[in-house]
Amino acid sequence: MENRYAIILAAGKGTRMKSKLYKVLHPVAGKPMVEHILDQVEQTEPTEIVTIVGHGAEMIKSHLGERSQYALQAEQLGTGHAVMQAQELLGGKQGTTLVITGDTPLLTAETLKNLFDYHQGKNASATILTAHAEDPTGYGRIIRDHVGIVERIVEQKDASEEEARVQEINTGTFCFDNESLFEALAKTDTNNTQGEYYLTDIIEILKKEGKAVAAYQMADFDEAMGVNDRVALSTANKIMHRRLNEMHMRNGVTFIDPDTTYIDEGVVIGSDTVIEAGVTIKGKTVIGEDCLIGAHSEIVDSHIGNQVVVKQSVIEESVVHEGADVGPYAHLRPKADVGANVHIGNFVEVKNATIDEGTKVGHLTYVGDATLGKDINVGCGVVFVNYDGKNKHQTIVGDHAFIGSATNIVAPVTIGDHAVTAAGSTITEDVPSEDLAIARARQVNKEGYAKKLPYMKD
């Protein structure tokens, strides 16, 4: 196979996004658009990849790292000018060069591979990736002669009435013979209404030189969509989420309502797991087999074991082991580690805490900066008081302990195995194993006192 190269155009400012964030870094299904492109390009196995950067160059480099080389387009003078910036890295090399924009996140590796193969099969100097558009408004039209050979690309504003009816459009992605590409770029000029170097002018230059120009029409028009504003970004997200949901369903995951379920690129879900409506799963989350993720739950960068049930809860940067159940309305904050068969009930918050196998934290409880052993019962309304106003402190609770309802545990404290805290206690000292700790005032009943209270009178 001959050498393959790729140039990703990512220097545009993206003013129509009206955003402080660089356009190609806007996420689609949780991943920056330009990273989607790079992922797909890498699957075509190019020898070298060059990303053209301009505004926000350092942000792009920090995202893509050493996966790409970079060339700076300091002044934006058109797509042709952008490709010129790669000449120092790719000029004079033999092979085929893919030119692709960084704002087309829906393009797939399969389409790009087909484009490469078609280009090489036609022995063309240039091949345009095209698509059939039901409404081609705004796109450049592919004009072919009577036998179907590509003649030129006509932009919308320059198209005649007949040309405007053409439904085959230019997607902005091309394959070029690398040497022909840079030779033709040297012959482009800025004699147009925008005063820019157009990459599309190369097609006419190559045709005039008698070189072969081909066009490969891809099957799915959705892949052609460029993202230039928030409306297009929303559409791209919808399409990408649909693709991802369909992939998971084909892999054995049940979605109760795919249209309201939002799964990021890169999330892993095991077979026979059920995802209910309104669920959002983000980042590098891994979910095991035979789980139930209840309606309106949100899971971010977490690892969920097999046979876990999550009901209407938020889980962030946490681990939930096999057979545990969480919720409804629980919140696992970063560094929560919930053991096998643990029960985390309604309105429980866990942060930077390890809860071992079989422990039950039923309701209305805060567990922060703590290590809980096995088979503990934590009653209603328990607070692990971990913050003294300056520093966080740790609490350790041993196996088989019983923490009575409304206990305040003021860290740092260690509660031993099989120890018990009485309901309503404020624990400020260690509790030895098998001891009962009572830390509350003795009850006093004042006879007849209630009658003296003004709100108790008739």
From Swiss-Prot:
A cellular component term, taken from the record's GO annotations: cytoplasm
The UniProt note on the cofactor reads as follows: Binds 1 Mg(2+) ion per subunit.
Positions binding acetyl-CoA in this chain are: N386, Y387, S405, A423, R440
Residues given in the record as UDP-N-acetyl-alpha-D-glucosamine binding sites:
9-12, 23, 73, 78-79, 140, 155, 170, 228, 333, 351, 366, 377
Pyrophosphorylase: annotated segments: 1-230
Its UniProt pathway annotation is:
Nucleotide-sugar biosynthesis; UDP-N-acetyl-alpha-D-glucosamine biosynthesis; N-acetyl-alpha-D-glucosamine 1-phosphate from alpha-D-glucosamine 6-phosphate (route II): step 2/2; Nucleotide-sugar biosynthesis; UDP-N-acetyl-alpha-D-glucosamine biosynthesis; UDP-N-acetyl-alpha-D-glucosamine from N-acetyl-alpha-D-glucosamine 1-phosphate: step 1/1; Bacterial outer membrane biogenesis; LPS lipid A biosynthesis
Q: Provide the residue span(s) of the region labelled Linker.
A: 231-251
The record ties this protein, via InterPro entries, to: Bifunctional_GlmU, GlmU-like, GlmU_C_LbH, Hexapep, NTP_transferase_dom, Nucleotide-diphossugar_trans, Trimer_LpxA-like_sf
Family per similarity comment? In the N-terminal section; belongs to the N-acetylglucosamine-1-phosphate uridyltransferase family.
Assembly, per entry:
Homotrimer.
Protein name per the record: Bifunctional protein GlmU
Organism classification:
Bacteria, Bacillati, Bacillota, Bacilli, Lactobacillales
